[in-house]
C-alpha cells in the first residue's frame, strides 16, 4: 500500500511539472503577460510621441507659423524692423562685507560672577 501511494505521488508530481514549469506552464504565461503589459505601456508612449511629431510635420508643411516659431526660439532670429529684448532674472545680491566671525566660546553653567 505504501509503495502504491508513493508511486501515485510521483506520478502526480510528474503530471504537475509541465503545468507549472513547462514551456506553456503558468510561470511562463505569467511572465509573458508581464512582458505584454510593459510593451503596451511603451507603445502608448511611442504613439503619443509619434502624434506630436506628426502634428509638427504637418505644421511645417502647411504654414510658415511653425517655421517662424522654430527660427525665433531655436535659432534666435528676428524679423526686419523687430528689436530683440530679453528679460533676465536679477542675480541674488552679494554682500560686500564679510560675515561676522562666530562668538567666542562662553562658559555656561558657572554662575558668571
Swiss-Prot record:
Membrane topology according to the record: Single-pass type II membrane protein
UniProt KW Cell inner membrane keyword: yes
Major location category of this protein: membrane
Disordered: annotated segments: 93-113
Topological domains annotated Cytoplasmic: 1-3
Coiled coil: 34-64
Record flagged with keyword Aminoacyl-tRNA synthetase: no
Keyword tags: Cell cycle, Cell division, Cell inner membrane, Cell membrane, Coiled coil, Membrane, Transmembrane, Transmembrane helix
A Pfam family annotated for this UniProt entry: DivIC
InterPro entries, A to Z: Cell_div_FtsB, FtsL/DivIC
Family as reported in the entry's similarity comment: Belongs to the FtsB family.
Self-association and partners: Part of a complex composed of FtsB, FtsL and FtsQ.
Name assigned to this protein: Cell division protein FtsB
Native species: Cupriavidus metallidurans (strain ATCC 43123 / DSM 2839 / NBRC 102507 / CH34)
Taxonomic path: Bacteria, Pseudomonadati, Pseudomonadota, Betaproteobacteria, Burkholderiales
